[in-house]
């Protein structure tokens, strides 16, 4: 299992002060994704062109001769590159980085346990995020059970795009889900997120009917889901759920992921989206 980030002292990923573990791999491909390095389950190389000083240190250090310095910056031959990470280690300008570090459950627990004093004093815990953590049910459940044995509050930030039996197993081993509701129309959901939404909505209803705690977030994106029809359908669906706490966060669109797509060399925003103002959201 590869992890692409560990965020300490997180305060927006559940109650209290938390440590958030970002797992690589996601079955969705949302066109506005702000963590595109979390979509692939494998290691990836990120290159920040504006940091590069053209010193050729990485070119000379690469054991596979996969790098070339051009007027456009460093070009990587994907057929040669083994993602060994030497280029990132030697780069004096920090223009190269490898996204994805392989962790065992024991190693991740050591990282989590370092934060216990902050968790205890703030009634915080650990949040498993992604990517999509439910894409790795075996390692995820192992970690959730280990945290449960330590009395650590457990949250899972998930799309809920997973087999119902996986959702049930995870639900039995965590205290909180953090779930996005992106688009009620299944065809539009498939267009903008890469998969239809029937499984997601069915799993969300199952979680609600089990009276399991969850926070709901709706990213509002003009041209995707911020229209009156989708908002009305979203409200009607949520009102139909046997849901006690009813915590809904409306998230305005941002383009933080743009720079990450540039580093990965992937396409960002095939459609131009508009930033919604707070008065518009209200």
Which residue stretches match the model-derived regions?
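Conserved small/polar residues in nucleotide/adenosyl-binding loops
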Residues: 274-280
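A short acidic, glycine-rich active-site loop
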Residues: 190, 269-273
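Iron-sulfur cluster-binding cysteine motifs and their immediate structural context
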Residues: 31-38, 57-75, 86-102
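Short glycine/proline- and charge-enriched loop/turn segments
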Residues: 262-270
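N-terminal pre-triad scaffold of radical SAM enzymes
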Residues: 4-57, 74-83
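Conserved AdoMet/S-adenosylmethionine-binding subsite of the radical SAM
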Residues: 106-262
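Glycine/small-residue-rich loop that forms an oxyanion/phosphate-binding "nest" at active or ligand-binding sites
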Residues: 71, 80, 85-90, 104, ...
């Amino acid at each position: 299992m590869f992890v692409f980030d560990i965020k300490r002292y997180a305060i927006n990923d559940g109650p209290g002060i938390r440590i958030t573990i970002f797992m690589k791999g996601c079955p969705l491909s949302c066109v506005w994704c702000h963590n595109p390095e979390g979509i692939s389950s494998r290691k990836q190389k990120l290159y920040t062109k504006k940091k590069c000083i053209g010193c050729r240190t990485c070119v000379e250090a690469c054991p596979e001769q996969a790098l070339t310095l051009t007027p456009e910056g460093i070009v990587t031959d994907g057929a040669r590159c083994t993602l060994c990470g030497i280029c990132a280690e030697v780069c004096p300008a920090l223009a190269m980085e490898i996204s994805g570090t392989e962790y065992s459950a024991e190693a991740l627990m050591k990282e989590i346990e370092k934060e216990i004093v902050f968790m205890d004093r703030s009634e915080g815990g650990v949040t498993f995020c992604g990517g999509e953590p439910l894409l790795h049910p075996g390692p995820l459940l192992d970690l959730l059970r280990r945290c449960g044995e330590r009395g650590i509050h457990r949250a899972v930030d998930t799309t809920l795009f997973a087999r119902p039996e996986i959702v049930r197993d995870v639900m039995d081993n965590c205290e909180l889900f953090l779930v996005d509701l992106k688009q009620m129309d299944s065809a539009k959901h498939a267009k903008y997120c890469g998969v239809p939404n029937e499984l997601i909505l069915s799993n969300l209803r199952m979680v609600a009917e089990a009276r399991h705690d969850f926070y709901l977030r709706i990213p509002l994106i003009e041209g995707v889901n911020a229209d009156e029809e989708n908002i009305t359908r979203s409200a009607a669906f949520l009102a139909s759920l046997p849901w006690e706490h009813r915590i809904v966060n409306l998230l305005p669109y941002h383009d933080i992921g743009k720079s990450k797509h540039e580093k990965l060399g992937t396409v960002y925003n095939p459609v131009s989206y508009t930033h919604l103002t707070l008065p518009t959201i209200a």
